[in-house]
A protein has these predicted regions:
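Low-complexity, intrinsically disordered Gly/Pro/Thr-rich segments
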Residues: 121-139
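Cysteine-rich micro-motifs
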Residues: 105-113
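C-terminal motif of bacterial Sec signal peptides marking the signal peptidase cleavage site
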Residues: 13-16
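N-terminal pre-ligand scaffold of iron-sulfur
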Residues: 18-103, 118, 135-152
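Sec-dependent signal peptide recognition
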Residues: 2-9
Length: 152
């Protein structure tokens, strides 16, 4: 019985020595406030998103509706590259192309490794190279001032 236990422990140790990811992405200082209804942020209005300077490689702020916002670090936990929200190119009725973002199914993606995360909680999608969640910054909507605060 002791030989079986030793063999199982050895097998478990060998299996766990595979590719390991370190989910500790370096995070820079992030503290800012904005008025999300300001026309300075046109892509944020109406369940959209905006990129901001801060953190390690930037912050993506996403409007989830009803004054609810999420903010994520734009550094890929797997390879350290900057993540983006992929755009779609749509042919308009007037025959011109325009860039649109699928707000109802907004996914964050690393263009280098192909990992993808869902916008609601930063969880990696099935099939992604990374199994790490995106770093989440805190957000606070102040109803009295109409300002949104984002920070570490």
């Amino acid at each position: 019985m002791r030989k079986v236990s030793t063999a199982l422990l050895l097998l478990l140790a060998l299996v766990s020595c595979g590719k390991r990811q370190d989910c500790n992405v370096p995070i820079g200082e992030t503290n800012f406030s904005i008025d999300p209804n300001d026309m300075q942020y046109p892509h944020l209005i109406g369940d959209g998103f905006e990129y901001f300077i801060g953190g390690n490689q930037g912050v993506v702020l996403i409007d989830m509706g009803s004054h609810s916002y999420v903010a994520y670090e734009r550094t890929c936990p797997l390879d350290g590259h900057q993540i983006v929200i992929p755009a779609d190119t749509v042919l308009g009725a007037d025959g011109t192309y325009r860039i649109t973002y699928p707000y109802s199914n907004m996914i964050l993606q690393c263009p280098q490794c192909g990992s993808r995360w869902i916008n609601t909680d930063g969880a990696p999608l099935e099939g992604s190279e990374s199994y790490c969640y995106l770093h989440h910054y805190s957000t606070y909507w102040d109803y009295t001032t109409g300002l949104l605060y984002v920070g570490n």
